[in-house]
């Protein structure tokens, strides 16, 4: 017997004009994982799209098809914009703003939400300075959710974000230097990062 999950996480889908069928298949599999683990929620940690400057029509319609698939399956999608979903890194707006579905919860700025009795902090991609501002706002809300008894003392705190933190190694082996330090997240149960 499989355990009940709070959500299923996916990051960095990178939908482009050549991989629509593959990405649709990934979401079909995610829906099946949701069914298997008795959840109706997918969390996407950014980069639905690949192109920063413009989206080909096929990408826009493929994403709409995926959202229709999620709706039909009764699956909710929490999503944050990644760097590939924006034209301006410090703008809250992204290509994801053009899709208005009740099942899609777009976290455009730092937010703290209670899901299944646990706290989820969502911080989209921004430049480091703006990211810190958004994180601090969301973290204050998280702290107040615990202080005001909105969640149990032993509830987990999850950070879902799209950023490069200090000390992270890139695929090319280079190391990220950033004002965002891992030590800032000591109160979090898990920090789940896309980029």
Task: Describe the residue ranges of each PLM region.
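Mobile, glycine- and charge-enriched loop segments
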Residues: 1-23, 144-145, 151-164
């Amino acid at each position: 017997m499989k355990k009940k999950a709070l959500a299923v996480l996916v990051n960095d889908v990178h939908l482009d004009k050549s991989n629509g069928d593959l990405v649709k298949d990934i979401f079909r599999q995610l829906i099946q994982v949701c069914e298997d683990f008795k959840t109706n929620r997918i969390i996407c940690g950014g980069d639905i799209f690949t192109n920063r400057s413009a989206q080909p029509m096929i990408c826009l319609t493929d994403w709409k098809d995926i959202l229709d698939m999620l709706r039909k399956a009764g699956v909710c999608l929490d999503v944050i914009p990644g760097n590939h979903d924006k034209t301006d890194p410090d703008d809250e707006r992204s290509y994801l703003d053009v899709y208005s579905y009740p099942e899609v919860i777009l976290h455009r700025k730092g937010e703290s939400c209670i899901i299944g009795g646990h706290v989820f902090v969502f911080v989209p991609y921004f430049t480091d300075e703006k990211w810190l501002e958004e994180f601090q706002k969301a973290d204050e809300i998280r702290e107040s959710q615990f202080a005001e008894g909105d969640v149990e003392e032993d509830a987990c705190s999850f950070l879902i974000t799209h950023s490069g933190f200090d000390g992270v190694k890139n695929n090319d082996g280079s190391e990220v230097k950033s004002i965002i330090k891992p030590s800032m997240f000591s109160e979090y149960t898990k920090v789940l990062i896309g980029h």
